[in-house]
């Protein structure tokens, strides 16, 4: 009897300890940070950025007409980078799938999100819609494996012009028509431009998302190339303030290109959720510093990239 009672008490102790651990993890109030490797356009660069501490990457997708053809940036680009690294779009997506599919020999558990910087600036309205269709079909086939054990990472589609909201509408229509509407749970959107002659107001950005049929899953970016003066981050602060407002429509805010320790600290102090960098280890180092490690942490797959974390 006493042995039986001891076993019962022992089991309850283990259960309670486990519960305390779960509560502790759920009670972590630190802001999760997405550490985005910048301009990762060649497949050989993917493990390099991941090993340097990135939990997400950004790639530039160029088009021939409405057809996504390469992951490629071109010149000019950030100081110190090779601007002409590239891969065929389909191959790039297939490789991303390898790195984000549990059980694959290349799988990286910490690789949880990628941003496709879609170079649609030269496309007309009809081409923009067709491009949205082609991106949807490309992701469905080459990344999500037609819904059969595809990659698990979240995807952010970043467009350079708020006038290109039809891209998003068509993208969503295609996934629904193909019977994979559920995959939209994995997709977010960024409409952040055009930059010239001046950036659109946040009200105009919000209206573009309404036209796109997007309510939630909004990532909004701001930034400068790494060879430009930092400035006062006024636009970034405005975006963060809008994210945190009662009528905020923004889920996450990210800033680019951040390569310095001082700029990383400033961006975190402003309240960003993500930092795009050429040197992911810099962000990791700052996240481990006194004054930051108690406020911020690297995001994991369990963190919802569409959930707003206010200051």
Curated annotation (Swiss-Prot):
Molecular function in Gene Ontology: lyase activity; metal ion binding; phosphoric diester hydrolase activity; toxin activity
Signal peptide (residue range): 1-21
Main enzyme class: lyase
GO biological process, one term: killing of cells of another organism
Tissue: Expressed by the venom gland.
Lineage: Eukaryota, Metazoa, Ecdysozoa, Arthropoda, Chelicerata
Cofactor(s) required, per the database record: Mg(2+)
Coiled coil: none
Name by which UniProt lists this protein: Dermonecrotic toxin LlSicTox-alphaIII3i
Chief place of localization: secreted
Purpose of the protein: Dermonecrotic toxins cleave the phosphodiester linkage between the phosphate and headgroup of certain phospholipids (sphingolipid and lysolipid substrates), forming an alcohol (often choline) and a cyclic phosphate. This toxin acts on sphingomyelin (SM). It may also act on ceramide phosphoethanolamine (CPE), lysophosphatidylcholine (LPC) and lysophosphatidylethanolamine (LPE), but not on lysophosphatidylserine (LPS), and lysophosphatidylglycerol (LPG). It acts by transphosphatidylation, releasing exclusively cyclic phosphate products as second products.
Entry EC number(s): 4.6.1.-
Catalytic residues of the enzyme: 38, 73
Keyword terms: Cytolysis, Dermonecrotic toxin, Disulfide bond, Hemolysis, Lipid degradation, Lipid metabolism, Lyase, Magnesium, Metal-binding, Secreted, Signal, Toxin, Zymogen
Cofactor note: Binds 1 Mg(2+) ion per subunit.
CC per GO annotation: extracellular region
Propeptide part(s) removed at maturation, as residue ranges: 22-26
Disulfide feature: 77-83
Residues at which Mg(2+) binds: 58, 60, 117
Localization annotation: Secreted
Homology family: Belongs to the arthropod phospholipase D family. Class I subfamily.
Gene3D superfamilies in UniProt: Phosphatidylinositol (PI) phosphodiesterase
Residues annotated as transmembrane: none
Catalyzed reaction equations: an N-(acyl)-sphingosylphosphocholine = an N-(acyl)-sphingosyl-1,3-cyclic phosphate + choline; an N-(acyl)-sphingosylphosphoethanolamine = an N-(acyl)-sphingosyl-1,3-cyclic phosphate + ethanolamine; a 1-acyl-sn-glycero-3-phosphocholine = a 1-acyl-sn-glycero-2,3-cyclic phosphate + choline; a 1-acyl-sn-glycero-3-phosphoethanolamine = a 1-acyl-sn-glycero-2,3-cyclic phosphate + ethanolamine
Keyword presence, Secreted: yes
InterPro entries reported in the protein's UniProt record: PLC-like_Pdiesterase_TIM-brl
